[in-house]
Amino acid sequence: LPRLCYNVRVSGTKDTGSHHISPGLPAMPEEEKPMKHFRFRTSCISLLLALAMLAASLCACAVPGEPTASQTDPSNTAVTSADASENNAETTPSCSLPELDYGGDEIVILSRYREGWTAGEIAVESILHEPVNDAVYERNKIVEDRLNIKIRSVEINCEGAVEIVEKMMTSVGGGSHEYDLVAAACYTVVDNSLTGNLRDLRKSAYLDFDKPWWSQGFNESIEYKGMQFAVTGAAVLSMYRFAFATLFNKRLFTEAKVDYLYDNVRNGTWTLDYQNSIVETFYRDNGNGLQDETGDIYGFVSNDYIGVDPYWSACNVRILERDENGDYTFDNFDAQKLQNVAEKVLQLFYGHGNASYDYKHYGNDAEQDDIRNMFAAGNAAMATLRIMALESAVMRDMKDEYGVVPMPKYDEAQKDYGTLLHDQFTVLSIPKTALDDRRDRISAVMEALCYTSYNIVRPAYYDVALRSKLVSDPDSAEMLDLLFSKVYIDAGVIYTGPLSGFHDQFRQLMGQKSNRVMSTYQKKARSTRSALQKNIVQKLQKLYDSGNA
């Protein structure tokens, strides 16, 4: 299985080949019981059988050991769910949690419920004989039994991203400890972490940050001088579902005599220039000379709001990196490179007459549904969408077959493809009202949840739902492996608020059809450096100096 964001280059690291960082965890107290390692051993042929066996194996001791997790070869696409379960059991490192018994204590998790986005990510009510739902249900039961706790999920039904953090802040401001764990949109939590409302997870006893069920990319992007206030990984499926990709309609490609995009990806020629070169090939007007949502066939459909975000990662444009001392730096930002990217994107969106269709942003990213619906209706040859669009009823009912590939590269000279996660992917944090012993208890729950998700929920979603049901061919399954192995997390994107919406400005310029990108960003450079120091570095340093996070 690909390890999403686990062994990829990320903003804030040097390209030295290995990008793991030390977990910096304190040694276990001597009075703790000896560690027992838990490994999954299953050769199931159905997910429900796997869940039953995994539930039993998690509660039993295995021989201590730390086998090295290996990356599945993306070219090996003929993988059944049974093969995946067996392979996962053989390669997953064991969990190093000691025996812990919390006497039936209740752990309260505050999270966001948005249907089609994050619903059911933290908890579900019952078994529905649906793989992902049932895997989440079984995961929570396993963790409850393993630690002798009760998980109480408090889900707030909201479309916006900020309500969860606001509710947590109200609780913290009142000095009450209502919530043990908060699961909320990344950029809102990262912004709030600078206020001192969250506990330093690196000081907790049981989080093993180096394990593959935690996102190493996120860790390396957000860690500061041994402090870290949020974490993400296999416990939350938005780490998969919010990744951007290019979808293409196989029927329209066949009719236009254009080869499917898979070989272009493999040989490195899937670039913005190539995408631009084929857009007009697919366009067919219904006869009225106008751009109609139905009736016309378009070469490309997207939008100039979050639809332009993925080009930061896809074209290897970095905002924040780290200097030789490990501090954030803006000095490597390349405004000329972004200008060049903008010219290619403007050409793709607006330079082909009526051949591209641009949905304008409205609501809480509601235009993404319009893009998906146009593509599913067979009215667009290519579309930029998040992976979660594949789960919708209209995509499942789509008459035409479709393929999935990564976002196009900047040019053929660029070595790797790059994948961006929509900045609302879920991260986990602990409110500062949790005292030290409580924080350690919550950290044990977090470690158990993420480890169990890695072995149960992730295969249910990735292998059973996504690779086996939602994509129709082994080529797309191979592309998904590649796509997820190239996720890049830039601190300049997830710190968007403190940086005064630096990456958001690109959306505005593309929406205005403006090619003044270089001059605009050169003017912003001074204020961005100031914002970096004042709004991020100085606040992090203050938290570090206080030593009481």
Tell me what each language-model feature is:
Residues 276-279, 311-364:
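Glycine-centered hinge/linker elements that transmit conformational signals in sensory
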Residues 146-223:
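Extracytoplasmic "Venus flytrap"/periplasmic binding protein-like
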Residues 395-466:
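Extracytoplasmic/periplasmic substrate-recognition and gating elements
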Residues 1-87, 92, 143, 178-180, ...:
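Gram-positive cell-envelope targeting signals
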Residues 118-148, 246, 251:
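Short, polar/charged alpha-helical segment
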Residues 110, 115, 176-182, 186, ...:
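Extracytoplasmic/periplasmic solute-binding protein
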Residues 431-443, 451-549:
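Conserved C-terminal helix/tail region of periplasmic/extracytoplasmic solute-binding proteins
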Residues 103-130, 149-154, 180-181:
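Short, well-ordered beta-strand elements
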